[in-house]
């Protein structure tokens, strides 16, 4: 029987998932004046149904990563609808309206919270929490990283730094790629094997992909925004640099190079 704290966390997870679905669907519905767009909230239904099925029996807990995959696919589709196209909805955002830029930023920031609630309320098992806690924090930081890059696009409409549209589209593409990569760490736990060499190779490959495709790319984009357009991003530049260094240490430890001991 789950503790009351876990039950509260599960209730919050379900509530925030529904709230985010409604809020994101409201942007195309309001700005395109078409109520049928509210049906986009159904993009989160597979994640909700799968989560309910897993919560019904703790034996299904190893499949929790599939909930995140279903969620992140729906989340990326929402982002492409709002930020993509020749005339994106984010260009039409009105600060005077409830569903304006500030509400959109807060709605996007729910993604890391939803991730932490999903992983931390799966079970009362301390063994499970010890295994998942470090991974969930790292994933949440990368999600915040991606959301902050989307905020650069939103804020460009409020205070222009002269960032060209093609560069904004490049930011959007890399953000979506980083979100799609986010389930890799959870999949890695699911695919753990007794063969130490295979496990280390897979973990090293995943870490290298995340360093290159997420933090290195975002670091490059932020430095370009800073040097080319005067966009201050010093905090997240430092974050990307720190994560890259930690990731390189992890890869060295896994591969036993540079005098590092493997684990």
Language model feature labels by segment:
Residues 231-240, 247-250:
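Chromatin/DNA-recognition segments of nuclear transcriptional regulators
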Residues 5-15, 36-42, 66-73, 97-108, ...:
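Physicochemical signature of membrane-embedded alpha-helices that form the seven-helix bundle of GPCRs
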Residues 43, 48, 63-168:
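Membrane-embedded alpha-helical bundle segments of multi-pass proteins
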Residues 242-243, 258:
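Short, intrinsically disordered/low-complexity patches at protein termini
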Residues 1-107, 227, 254, 259:
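N-terminal signal-anchor/initial transmembrane insertion module
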Residues 122-229, 248-263:
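Multipass alpha-helical transmembrane domains of eukaryotic endomembrane proteins
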Residues 19, 23, 50-53, 77-80, ...:
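Residue-level signal for alpha-helical transmembrane segments in multi-pass membrane proteins
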């Amino acid at each position: 029987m789950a503790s009351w704290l876990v039950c509260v966390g599960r209730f919050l997870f379900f509530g925030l998932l529904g709230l985010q679905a409604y809020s994101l669907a409201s942007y195309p519905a309001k700005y395109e004046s078409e109520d049928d767009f509210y049906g986009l909230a159904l993009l989160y239904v597979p994640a909700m149904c799968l989560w309910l099925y897993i919560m019904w029996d703790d034996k299904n807990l190893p499949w929790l990563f599939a909930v995140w995959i279903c969620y992140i696919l729906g989340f990326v589709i929402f982002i492409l609808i709002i930020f993509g196209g020749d005339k994106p909805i984010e260009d039409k955002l009105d600060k005077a309206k409830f569903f304006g830029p500030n509400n959109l930023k807060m709605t996007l920031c729910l993604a890391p919270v939803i991730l932490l609630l999903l992983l931390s309320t799966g079970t009362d098992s301390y063994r499970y929490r010890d295994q998942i806690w470090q991974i969930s924090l790292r994933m949440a930081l990368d999600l915040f990283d991606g959301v902050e890059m989307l905020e650069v696009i939103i804020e460009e409409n409020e205070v222009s730094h002269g960032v060209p549209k093609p560069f904004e589209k490049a930011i959007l593409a890399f953000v979506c790629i980083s979100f799609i990569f986010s389930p890799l760490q959870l999949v890695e736990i699911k695919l753990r094997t007794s063969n130490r060499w295979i496990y280390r190779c897979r973990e090293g490959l995943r870490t290298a992909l995340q360093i290159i495709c997420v933090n290195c790319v975002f670091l490059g984009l932020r430095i370009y925004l800073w040097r080319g357009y005067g966009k201050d991003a010093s905090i997240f530049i430092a974050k990307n640099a720190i994560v890259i260094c930690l990731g390189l240490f992890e890869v060295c430890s896994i591969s036993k190079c540079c005098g590092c001991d493997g684990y």
